[in-house]
Amino acid sequence: MSVTATIRIQQADFDVAQEIAALSKGRTDVGAVVSFSGICRGSENGEPIAALTLEHYPGMAEAEIGRHADEALSRWPLQGLTIIHRFGRIAPGENIVLVVTASAHRQAAFEAAEFLMDYLKTNAPFWKREESEKGTSWVEAHDHDDAAAARWTKS
């Protein structure tokens, strides 16, 4: 059975439980479902955050995420894959991103989800701006995020 990833880039929030259920309900070939949901924090380094604004390059973002989803599907035996990433102004407590992987066994589901999140955190064409009492500032990837993503590079 050929698996196609579900990829959505949207402004609206999403229901994590509903997305997980949609991927796994009634499936007898799925033995493991792993999900990661990224949520907007209300503070960074002790400083309150009013909101995040995520910008993306339409078309390019979908294509790049699709390319990495295809790589995950070729590297791990997945029965299902959903990636949702929001853009626009996001308030603390709201969802930002969701990755759900389904496989017959847990190792493939965990590794594929981690691979995809490491990519999304470091190289996906999204730009994040924090709003705080001090003003706005662009958020850069951290060194530890780059190191996590580098471990998936094929030699």
What is each model feature region?
Residues 96-103:
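Short glycine-rich or small-residue beta-strand-to-loop segments that form or flank ligand, phosphate
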Residues 1-96, 110-114, 118-155:
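N-terminal, polar/charged subdomain of small-to-medium soluble alpha/beta proteins
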